[in-house]
Design a protein with these regions (language model features):
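Acidic-basic catalytic patches of nuclease active cores, encompassing PD-(D/E)XK
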Residues: 1-24, 67, 82
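Histidine- and/or cysteine-centered catalytic micro-motif in compact active-site loops
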Residues: 23-24, 42-44, 77
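Beta-rich nucleic-acid/ligand-interaction surfaces
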Residues: 25-29
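Conserved catalytic cores of phosphodiester-cleaving nucleases, focusing on short active-site segments
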Residues: 30-47
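Active-site-adjacent loop/helix micro-motif of nuclease/hydrolase catalytic cores
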Residues: 45-58
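Basic, amphipathic alpha-helical patches used to engage nucleic acids or provide basic targeting signals
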Residues: 55-68
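Nucleic-acid nuclease catalytic cores
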Residues: 65-91
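Intrinsically disordered, low-complexity terminal regions enriched in charged/polar residues
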Residues: 83-131
Length: 131
């Protein structure tokens, strides 16, 4: 499932007032005023028991959501379903540096060190059993 499909699924099934961000490189993907959510979307081709989040994305979500008085959410799709993570202080994320591609689906395949953490599926809410 591509991020555009994930957005449409969420809009159709969960958040009818979901609005996409306007910029390609915004620090978020969408918002819902009805549910007071500031959301980053991620589509994964492979299912894992933990889902990666970059520290820089996490920090941007926390700061920008707080400035807008919205709750920061990180929503992931995998081949086995959709998981939503409300990024609250009680979710402890161990951070580590990993050598990863600069981007996921673009022509630039070079790698850099990135600070990342892994969210256990149990810390999120499963929105659908399979998509």
């Amino acid at each position: 499932m591509k991020e555009a499909d994930l957005f449409q699924y969420l809009k159709d099934s969960h958040y009818p007032d979901l609005v996409k961000s306007e910029g390609t490189y915004d620090t978020f993907d969408c918002t819902t005023e009805q549910f007071k959510m500031y959301i980053e979307l991620k589509s994964r081709r492979t299912h894992y028991p933990t889902l990666l989040i970059e520290k820089s994305k996490y920090d941007n979500l926390i700061l920008a959501a707080g400035a807008r008085q919205l709750a920061p959410w990180y929503i992931n799709s995998t081949p086995e379903g959709v998981w939503a993570f409300h990024l609250t202080p009680d979710i402890e994320i161990p951070w580590s540096t990993q050598y990863l591609p600069v981007t996921t689906d673009f022509a630039n395949k070079s790698k850099i060190d990135k600070m990342v953490g892994f969210l256990p599926l149990e810390a999120g809410v499963q929105l659908d059993a399979s998509v």
